[in-house]
Amino acid sequence: LADFCHEQEGLPCWRETSVIHAPYCRISKLLSGYRRPDLTHLQPVGRGRVTSEPLEETGTFTVAGHVFRVLEGAGGHVRGEACYLCDDLALAFPGDIYVNAAGFTQAQSRFNQLAPYLMTSVNMNSPMASAERKAFVALVGRKYHILSGHGAPIWGEE
């Protein structure tokens, strides 16, 4: 939410403050037609992080009677990124903490090949990003249906 607030004020998002990441972010926004969200439709959920664990549960919210847990990452991929887990539906929305690269379309794969040339890594802290992915996989195992930020869904085992 903090990054969206910065954008509303005409300031760069956290990732764009990095000389290494700013060009890639700007190109991504141009190619995707990105528009800032209307903040009247957003609200913070839970509390901020208090531990140094790769993933930390920071709150919950309910949609149609289903409780979703909010797990915030430690900033490996990008600061403030979160996963949303619904245990009773076995649904996981990990954002970019965990992506299905094998399920990328050809266009996504070609675009992602630009990253090494435009910046050294898509992560702000690659060792922490790896720890976040490992924590996510340990948490959901093969039970959850995973709908990540990129790539095709991964359907869990029943």
Language-model regions, residue ranges each:
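Metallo-beta-lactamase
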Residues: A2-E157
